[in-house]
Amino acid sequence: MLIRVEIGIDAALLRRAFESDAEAQLVHDLREDGLITLGLVATDDEGQVVGYVAFSPAIVQGEELQWVGMAPLAVDENYRGQGLARQLVYEGLDSLNEFGYAAVVTLGDPAFYGRLGFEQAAHYDLRCRWPGTESAFQVHRLADDALNGVNGLVEYHDHFNRF
């Protein structure tokens, strides 16, 4: 298994990693608009894409604070349960930390993301625009001071509003 930065030719192979075409279309739209801060793929021994994670800009209370949103994260069903999602997330967090980003937000299972160092964003008075997601909205600080004095609405790009 190899985890690497995505390249243009991977686009056609991504649909295999997603459960629905909506996620693949989201990635396509983000890429077309130059909004993927970092995209990583996991490939099998034959070079087929079997996992994917994207990070794109997120703003807090209308301000650019070097935060990114992590979505989508997907692993081909034949490769689930092998720690591939965890590896993709860790690789992304490491790279974003090296690039100087301050924090990463995501929506997902608190038990899974909690094991990866994410915390409920609500503990820091952070929220996203989608009602009923309070327990699923997570934040991971990359910079020690990323959450100092920061609170309010965290927004992903409008492309995410279709979900």
Name each model-derived stretch:
Residues 48, 63, 76-87, 99, ...:
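Conserved glycine-rich acetyl-CoA-binding loop
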